[in-house]
């Protein structure tokens, strides 16, 4: 299956259409409301108070309510430190996926536990809370935690460090000169060179991601894969690559990546979370994080401010810059990839919309020039919702004041 099929499986048709409005360009209105910090909670505002057109957002909301774009659970918009649009769309997932929840398959290789994706106890919300599965947006957050450890000196290895440094090579299969050259940077940019098939849907028995999740030892499954290309040369989306980071983080720092993230990222930003673990207790950094849409937006807000949060340095400006650098072309519709961030090119080809994207309809979208953040959650895990190309034109008038006061991205 092509890269485009894989991205569509994550609900990115909606992402691309929504970002298209900003690829068309925004007017030159000056000034705007000042920014604030949402550590305890987002200040509540209105679209008009931050220079957005409410009718444009309400039109999209109406289509979500009507089911035009599939099983969307939430749609939230943030600007200038305020939450200005918040809509939830309840669904009876126990009824929708009841049959699938009882039949073993690639998305529920184990009928009980957190890796039955049809089980309403843990999907899409965690145990009746408002914490929603982030799926592969977890990768974007993992990258942030990794960068924090680098900045603080707790992760001392350079990005050119070979991945096999952290393994007993005698116990790793398919070792060759290419696998020996695979580096941490290759893992961060999805250019490991490993033979990995995530081009098929996750309910396809050939999916390496689903096959990995059916095993006890995810890390061993990944590192044992043969090489297909030279590392650092070819983008190949691999959830397994990000799972390696949880293992490598513990080996390098001696600390659990979730506990480290709680202390140095989640607590300072006021983020509550749940994080699934593999059957061997390794943090599921490839897709196991649960957040609210409002707390997910804080990650975008942190990156909008170059890693600063209310006067405190959380992650280095250099890591933010590297994370949002287009290191590799994904091979689909101009999308580039940084350190676990998807980068969608704007009209001028030099600037990007920053995105975290997850299976089922999870997405974090950041528009730096406009200081605008949008989050979406959903649980459309069996079908690929379509979207009208005209959606971009419907949303273009939403930004009527170009920037917030105090905008670092003028």
Please describe what each predicted stretch is:
Residues 2-16:
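Bacterial N-terminal signal peptides that target proteins for export
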Residues 87, 97-122, 160-164, 203-230, ...:
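Short, charged, amphipathic alpha-helices and their helix-cap/turn boundaries
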Residues 143, 241-248, 287-308, 362-378:
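Active-site-proximal alpha-helical segments within enzyme catalytic domains
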Residues 272-273, 320-375:
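Active-site Gly/Thr loop motif
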Residues 122-124, 128, 151-194, 224-226, ...:
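Active-site helix/loop module of the DD-peptidase/beta-lactamase fold
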Residues 356-410:
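Structured C-terminal helix/loop/strand segments within mature extracytoplasmic catalytic/sensor domains
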Residues 19-126, 150-156, 216, 394-410:
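N-terminal leader/targeting segments and the immediately adjacent pre-domain N-terminus
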Residues 53, 58, 81, 112-113, ...:
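Active-site SXXK
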């Amino acid at each position: 299956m092509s890269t485009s099929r894989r991205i569509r499986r994550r609900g990115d048709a909606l992402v691309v259409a929504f970002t298209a409005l900003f690829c068309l360009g925004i007017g030159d209105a000056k000034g705007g409301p000042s920014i604030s910090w949402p550590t305890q909670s987002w200040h509540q505002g209105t679209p008009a108070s931050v220079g957005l057109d409410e009718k444009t957002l309400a039109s999209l909301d109406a289509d979500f309510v009507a089911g035009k774009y599939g099983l969307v659970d939430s749609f939230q918009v943030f600007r200038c430190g305020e939450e200005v649009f918040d809509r939830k769309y309840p669904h009876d997932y126990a009824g929708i996926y009841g049959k699938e929840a009882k039949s073993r398959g690639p998305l529920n290789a184990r009928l009980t536990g957190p890796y039955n994706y049809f089980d309403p106890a843990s999907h899409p919300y965690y145990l009746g809370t408002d914490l929603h599965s982030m799926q592969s947006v977890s990768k974007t957050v993992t990258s942030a935690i990794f960068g924090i450890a680098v900045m603080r000196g707790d992760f001392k290895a350079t990005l050119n460090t070979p991945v096999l440094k952290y393994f007993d090579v005698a116990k790793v299969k398919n070792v060759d000169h290419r696998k020996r050259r695979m580096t941490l940077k290759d893992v961060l940019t999805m250019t490991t060179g490993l033979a990995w098939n995530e081009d098929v849907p996750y309910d396809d028995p050939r999916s390496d991601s689903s096959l990995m999740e059916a095993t006890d030892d995810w890390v061993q499954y990944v590192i044992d894969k043969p090489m297909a290309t030279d590392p650092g040369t070819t983008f190949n989306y691999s959830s397994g690559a990000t799972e390696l980071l949880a293992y490598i983080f513990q080996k390098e720092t001696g600390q659990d990546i979730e506990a480290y993230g709680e202390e140095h990222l989640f607590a300072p930003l006021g983020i509550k979370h749940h994080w699934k673990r593999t059957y061997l207790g390794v943090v599921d950094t490839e897709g196991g994080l649960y957040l609210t849409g409002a707390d997910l937006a804080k990650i975008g807000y942190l990156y909008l401010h170059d890693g600063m949060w209310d006067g405190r340095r959380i992650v280095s400006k250099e890591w933010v810059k590297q994370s949002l650098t287009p290191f590799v072309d994904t091979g689909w519709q101009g999308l580039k990839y940084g350190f676990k961030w998807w980068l969608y090119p704007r009209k001028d080809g030099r600037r990007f919309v920053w995105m975290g994207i997850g299976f089922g309809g999870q997405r974090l979208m950041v528009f730096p020039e406009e200081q605008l953040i949008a989050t979406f959650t959903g649980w459309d895990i069996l079908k690929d919702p379509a979207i009208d190309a005209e959606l971009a034109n419907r949303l273009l008038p939403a930004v009527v004041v170009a920037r917030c006061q105090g905008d670092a991205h003028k």
